[in-house]
From Swiss-Prot:
Function, as annotated: Possesses antiviral potency. Inhibits viral infection of plants (tobacco mosaic virus). Inhibits protein synthesis in both prokaryotes and eukaryotes.
Name this protein carries in UniProt: Antiviral protein II/III
Protein EC: 3.2.2.22
UniProt keyword annotations, A-Z: Antiviral defense, Disulfide bond, Hydrolase, Plant defense, Protein synthesis inhibitor, Signal, Toxin
Miscellaneous comment text of the record: 2 forms exist, PAP-II and PAP-III, that differ in their seasonal expression and chromatographic profiles. Both depurinate genomic RNA of immunodeficiency virus type-I (HIV-I) and bacteriophage (MS 2) RNA. PAP-II and PAP-III inhibit the replication of HIV-1 in human peripheral blood mononuclear cells with IC(50) values of 26 nM and 17 nM, respectively.
Any single Pfam family the record assigns to this protein: RIP
Source organism (scientific name): Phytolacca americana (American pokeweed)
SUPFAM superfamilies noted in UniProt: Ribosome inactivating proteins (RIP)
Positions annotated as active site in the UniProt record: 94, 142, 197, 200
Signal peptide boundaries: 1-25
Family: Belongs to the ribosome-inactivating protein family. Type 1 RIP subfamily.
Length: 310
């Protein structure tokens, strides 16, 4: 009897996994016609797509768990008649791969350490063995990307710089590996910071917006770089604060300010309003949840639907 129950449960889980789409609906960012305002709206939509629907910490939203389905959110970066589709893990905001159109067909590009399902996530139904046109020859870390694209501190973040790098690789032959890999790595370094890092950090979002239309964009300063390295640790420090309201928080030891000086403390209000936009998934010492927001939503929905049965 016990075995039959386990078999039924296993079958139910298998059916659920088959019915659950691997990725949520695409979020579109029109780079060609972007403004600082549409960029900010895009980041808000991305945060909504990856956040835990029930939990917050000190009023801040957090990413969902790594086991929550769907696994990915797809982001379409549009420019002219072309579109790059990025596959981003909802649980940690890692970029696992992307696709463009090459020779009239969807072409996937995946890192050496990409998730095994990234290929079919960006190019549904493509089970082909990865070749020169598909393999990104390094891991998805900054170290990997910088090995081909150079230091990210020298690459500006903004509309013009992003569009420029998109145009250099979209639909281009990847067999000219030296030049293609340099252009691709620069695109990835810019896209990752403008999409995933800016989703995590209001500080980076606001810096990019301030230089959004500048030819050279915003060159990441030491504060931004140190935040990029410490998303987990800053989130955990916030989670350990046991009192609600404003307070002074001791920050992780290797954070830097804009002038590359040690940045040791911040107020909770500063972290909430100016630095963080999305925490990693944490266990918060102060109990909080999305319950009031959820109940408010259902109340408004039920009230608005009362007239439908008249």
């Amino acid at each position: 009897m016990k075995m039959k129950v386990l078999e039924v449960v296993g079958l139910a889980i298998s059916i659920w996994l088959m019915l659950t789409p691997p990725a949520s609906s695409n979020i579109v960012f029109d780079v060609e016609n972007a403004t600082p305002e549409t960029y900010s709206n895009f980041l808000t939509s991305l945060r909504e797509a990856v956040k835990d629907k029930k939990l917050t910490c000190h009023g801040m939203i957090m990413a969902t768990t790594l086991t929550e389905q769907p696994k990915y959110v797809l982001v379409d970066l549009k420019f002219g008649s072309g579109t790059f589709t990025l596959a981003i893990r909802r649980g940690n905001l890692y970029l696992e791969g992307y696709s463009d159109i090459y020779n009239g067909k969807c072409r996937y590009r995946i890192f050496k350490d990409s998730e095994s399902d990234a290929q079919e996530t960006v190019c549904p139904g493509d089970k082909s063995k990865p070749g020169t046109q598909n393999n990104i020859p390094y891991e998805k870390s900054y170290k990997g990307m910088e090995s081909k694209g150079g230091a990210r501190t020298k690459l500006g973040l903004g509309k013009i710089t992003l569009k420029s790098r998109m145009g250099k690789i979209y639909g281009k032959d990847a067999t000219d590996q030296k030049q293609y890999q340099k252009n691709e790595a620069e695109f990835l370094l810019i896209a990752v910071q403008m999409v995933t890092e800016a989703s995590r950090f209001k500080y980076i979002e606001n810096k990019v917006k301030a230089k959004f239309d500048d030819a050279n964009g915003y060159q990441p300063d030491p504060k931004a770089i140190s935040l990029e390295k410490n998303w987990d640790s800053v989130s955990k420090v916030i989670a350990k604060v046991g009192t609600s309201g404003d307070s002074t928080v001791t920050l992780p030891g290797d954070l830097k300010d804009e002038n590359n000086k040690p940045w040791t403390t911040a107020t909770m209000n500063d972290l909430k309003n100016d630095i963080m936009a999305l925490l990693t998934h944490v266990t918060c010492k102060v109990k909080s949840s999305m319950f009031p927001e959820i109940m408010s939503y259902y109340y408004r929905t039920s009230i608005s639907n009362l007239g439908e049965f008249e």
